[in-house]
Amino acid sequence: PSLTLGCGSWGGNSVSENVGVKHLINIKTVAERRENMLWFRTPEKVYFKKGCMPVALDELGTVMNKKKAFIVTDSFLYKNGYVAPIEEKLDEMGIQHTCFFEVAPDPTLQCAQKGVDQMRAFEPDTIIALGGGSAMDAAKIMWVMYEHPEANFEDMAMDFMDIRKRVFTFPKMGEKAYFVAIPTSSGTGSEVTPFAIITDAETGVKWPIADYALLPNMAIVDVDNMMTQPKGLTSASGIDVMTHAIEAYVSIMATDYTDGLAMKAVKMVFENLPSAYDNGANDPKAREEMANASCMAGMAF
């Protein structure tokens, strides 16, 4: 009990009798506070270590018996041979494949629509996103449009306080295609995040989409795809890793599980970004540590 100004208890402030001591002793009832269940979610499979990509992709044929793969990337990566090792591995396993390489920075809904038109004609059972955040974001949106043509982006982008308690129920993913994400820069962490941003070029509206249904099924973090990053990209993406890790650590939704990943990622950035910037491919260890830091910060984020 506590002595308070006013009278009455249980939230009341008026009585039909003379105010006495019993009315000043206001016994409050407080509801029991229960915290939400928390969870830590990542892609089902996360492969890492230099040279891991061919081994990881081997599962598509030997374990999953996939038949058709649709590769999403940008023109630079396609023209500079980054797609070739993937195509060679798919050919080796007898998996048919085609490639959409028209993704631009800040991908648009119109670009995604063009890609998904090709996707529907090809009817793949696997989608492979190769690139930075833009390519992976575009591929995630294409995945949604391929599996659920009726999807409404205005509904999917609806604000929410808790990703588990949103008004809009995100459609179930993975019934048509298995999603593989392969980063070529150590920065966005999109290969392990449930986020995608798409812009409507006609209206200028950006749709930020967030739902655990957008988590890739497999992430392949092979530093062989990141060795030749230019200095500008190395520095910018390295700071991106740092901001993801710090934001994850100070978030009100931070947990013991995310804190460990976030702090380790920060430590790895401080220890390896300068050398990755100065020495590039001449310091493969620093490159690999930055690739891992990016993925870990993405998990924490």
Where do the model's predicted regions map?
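Electropositive phosphate-/nucleotide-binding environments in soluble metabolic enzymes
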Residues: 14-22, 46-50, 54, 63, ...
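Glycine/threonine-rich beta-strand-loop-alpha-helix active-site module
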Residues: 110-224
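Structural signal for hydrophobic packing residues in well-ordered secondary-structure cores
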Residues: 7, 25-35, 60, 64, ...
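Carboxylate- and glycine-rich phosphate/diphosphate-binding segment that chelates Mg2+/Mn2+
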Residues: 193-301
